[in-house]
C-alpha cells in the first residue's frame, strides 16, 4: 500500500509540473541571477526581443517585445 501511495503522489506531481507553463509563475530565464540571462532566454525562445526579472524577489522573467 505504501508503494501505491508513493506512485500516485509521484504521478500527480509530474502531471502538475507538466501542466504549468514555463513562463507563468515559474522562475525561468536565469532570474534572479541576471537580467541579461533573462533577455537571452526570451530571444532564444522567441518570446520577445528583450527581457528583465520582475516580481517581489525578481524571480520571474518577463519578456518584452
UniProtKB/Swiss-Prot annotation:
Localization (cell): Secreted
Top-rank lineage group of the source organism: Eukaryota
Cellular component per GO, a single term: extracellular region
Signal peptide bounds: 1-25
Keywords per UniProt: Disulfide bond, Ion channel impairing toxin, Neurotoxin, Potassium channel impairing toxin, Secreted, Signal, Toxin, Voltage-gated potassium channel impairing toxin
Task of the protein: This recombinant toxin inhibits the mammalian voltage-gated potassium channels Kv1.3/KCNA3 in vitro with an IC(50) of 26.40 nM.
Family indicated by similarity: Belongs to the short scorpion toxin superfamily. Potassium channel inhibitor family. Alpha-KTx 11 subfamily.
More details: Negative results: does not have effect on BK currents (KCa1.1/KCNMA1 channels).
Name the record gives this protein: Toxin KTx8
Amino acid at each position: 500500500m505504501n508503494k501505491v501511495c508513493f506512485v500516485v503522489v509521484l504521478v500527480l506531481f509530474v502531471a502538475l509540473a507538466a501542466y504549468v507553463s514555463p513562463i507563468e509563475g515559474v522562475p525561468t530565464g536565469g532570474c534572479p541571477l541576471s537580467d541579461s540571462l533573462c533577455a537571452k532566454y526570451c530571444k532564444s525562445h522567441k518570446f520577445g526581443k528583450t527581457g528583465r526579472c520582475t516580481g517581489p524577489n525578481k524571480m520571474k522573467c518577463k519578456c518584452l517585445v
